[in-house]
Amino acid sequence: MAKVTNRCFEATGHTAFICDFSPPRAGDPESFPQPNLDTDFISVAYNPGKAVRVNSAMLAAAIRGKTGKDVLFTLATRDMNKLALESLLLGGQMFGLDNVVVVQGDPFTERDLTRVKDVSDFTPTQMITAIADMNLGTDYRESQLRTPTGYCIGATLDLGRGIEAEATLAHRKAQAGAQFFISQPIFDVTEASRFHEAFAAASGQELALPVFFGLQVLEQDGIIFSTVPGTVKMELEDGRPGVEIALELYQDFQEAGLHNVYLVPPIRRGGARGYAATREVLAGVKRL
């Protein structure tokens, strides 16, 4: 199985795509979701919408086993203690998984907390450190593992929370052991250059790790979690196809030298995803 750092633009000289993929809300093997997405990697999300869904690592292993696609799985620190998280990572190792993305997980509301507990035994940065330690053969108790793990560790960025603050946090994550970054969708490519400048200012050196900047495929009636410019919203409302908007933004990415792309399919009410539109975008990219 390929590691993200071996398939990114910096390693190959070719644009690399990671595509987000939501686990189903059923474990019936007969309803196994077929991604059918021509991307370098399928990234299995962690319980989108804070809903009960198939475990991200298990689904990633199933996708890899049934389709041969290279995969990532997302792991949230919110829901498990150190023992559970590190045990899950050993299970992923057993199934040949090599790429993991560490997130905190969306915070629970007060209503949520009447039914479920926030564990947060690790912060995301601490979890990154712990995985890096497991790669060296040591668990959270400082006991030796029989076999070190070999995870390629991903961390996340949300430039909408403030570029300078996010750059400082990214520096800490890189120091902890992150090997690549995935960002929430951006619509202004200058945010990428400003992030790199802020990272250099915070760390004293340029960021040498690959960053997969988010490119969201929009639909008129879809749910939008990222900050979308008013002009783009107006274009959608006026009937411009989201696929067309995404392809135009992809060209902006290319002109700005952003050759690692995190593709986010449309999100529909109820949690369904618009993978058909995503396939149109990928087909359009090949024609450019």
Per-range role (PLM):
Residues 13-29, 71-83, 151-165, 230-245:
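Active-site mouth loops of central-metabolism enzymes
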Residues 206-259:
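Catalytic-face loop-and-helix region of soluble metabolic enzyme cores
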Residues 24-36, 56, 82-89, 162-173, ...:
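Short, acidic/polar
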Residues 2-7, 26-28, 50-63, 81-87, ...:
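Active-site-adjacent beta->alpha loops and helix N-cap segments on the catalytic face
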Residues 130-142, 146, 151, 176, ...:
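A structural motif corresponding to the C-terminal end of an alpha-helix
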Residues 1-44, 53:
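Conserved N-terminal beta1-alpha1 strand-loop-helix module at the mouth
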Residues 15-21, 40-44, 71-75, 100-102, ...:
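Hydrophobic faces of well-ordered beta-strands that scaffold small-molecule active sites
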